[in-house]
Amino acid sequence: MSGLFITFEGGEGAGKSTQIALLASHLRNHGFDPVITREPGGSPGAEAIRHVILSGNAETYGPAMEALLFAAARADHVDQLIRPALAEGRIVLCDRFIDSSRAYQGVTGNLDATYMAAIERIAIDGAMPDLTLVLDICAERGLSRAGKRRGSDTADRFEKEDIAVHEARRQAFLEIARQEPARCKVIDADRSQEKIADEIRSVVDTILTEKGLL
């Protein structure tokens, strides 16, 4: 795969979608045509599974079933969108990927790490991100932001969970970043959108320069 695969991770209300849009605009200004996608979803099959997961219909069957649904959606997403885009040399910006499964189903779902690693390996089949930006914000602040963004819409299955669960996921993302520093970069998301975007642009521009693309 010859493109660049960048994933954005973090808790609810961390500002991932906003920062993806800002980075995409920056990349377009430099002549790139980035692919913007999300998980769960990103391909027709994965979007169908997304509805089942976020509606809460899968929750009844427990975290193991939910993890398998995420893996099935991810496999289709990688096969139908991510891998072809990377083969074309495109830059792929993805809102959530493997680390969300590790944090949500693995850590707070109390699923065995070996089990999670096995289904992750099958789902991505080698399509690891080149860079993962972990947008870090305390759970209380993130949930407050998410609520304001949502307005009168109903909170999804994950937003409804206890704040202690959200904080545990935050710590899980930070631990992943500590364990994989070559791939992961923690970004302080409790700042203005502009300051966050500036740091992200700097990180990405450095990689593009190293690759001789900028």
Swiss-Prot record:
Disulfide bonds: none annotated. Keywords: ATP-binding, Kinase, Nucleotide biosynthesis, Nucleotide-binding, Transferase. It holds the Pfam family Thymidylate_kin. It catalyses: dTMP + ATP = dTDP + ADP. Its EC number is 2.7.4.9. GO terms for cellular component: cytosol. ATP binds at residues 10-17. GO terms for biological process: dTDP biosynthetic process; dTTP biosynthetic process; dUDP biosynthetic process. GO terms for molecular function: ATP binding; dTMP kinase activity. It is an enzyme of class 2 (transferase). PANTHER family: THYMIDYLATE KINASE, UMP-CMP KINASE 2, MITOCHONDRIAL. Phosphorylation of dTMP to form dTDP in both de novo and salvage pathways of dTTP synthesis. Belongs to the thymidylate kinase family. This is Thymidylate kinase. It comes from Brucella suis biovar 1 (strain 1330). The gene is tmk.
